[in-house]
């Protein structure tokens, strides 16, 4: 099991990779990470998405570019960090990133 510091490092690496690969900056999330910490920022992001039932605004960008691996929701599902999240948060992320049959 990894701790919050490791999660923070992984999130910052994902944000950096996203910026380099897809030119997506995760700017609002970065601001929240600075203000509240990585775990709280991601939980806040998930709460907003779950309450509005809207896809994250970056979803289409990453899906169209075949880079779903750059979604924060995939980091939530990482076995090293899944214990940091509620069952509801994990289920939401799993539903979001699981490919649907045509």
Task: Write out the residue ranges for each language-model feature.
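Charged, low-complexity surface segments at secondary-structure and domain boundaries
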Residues: 1, 13-17, 28-29, 43-44, ...
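Charged, compositionally biased N-terminal leader segments and the immediate start
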Residues: 1-21, 95-99
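A general marker of short, structured functional hotspots
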Residues: 3, 20-22, 32, 77, ...
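Short amphipathic alpha-helical segments that mediate assembly, nucleic-acid/protein binding
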Residues: 4-8, 26, 38-39, 68, ...
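Accessory DNA-engaging acidic/polar modules
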Residues: 10-13, 24, 50-57, 70, ...
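Amphipathic alpha-helical packing elements
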Residues: 15-64
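Amphipathic alpha-helical binding modules
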Residues: 61-102
């Amino acid at each position: 099991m990894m701790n919050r510091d490791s999660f923070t490092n992984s999130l910052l690496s994902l944000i950096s990779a996203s910026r380099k690969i897809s030119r997506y900056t995760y700017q609002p999330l970065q601001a929240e990470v600075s203000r509240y910490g990585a775990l709280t920022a991601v939980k806040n992001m998930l709460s907003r998405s779950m309450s509005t039932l809207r896809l994250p605004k970056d979803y289409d960008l990453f899906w169209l570019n075949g880079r779903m691996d750059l979604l924060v929701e995939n980091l939530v599902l990482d076995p090293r960090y899944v214990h940091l999240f509620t069952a509801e948060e994990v289920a939401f992320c799993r539903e979001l990133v699981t490919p649907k049959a045509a």
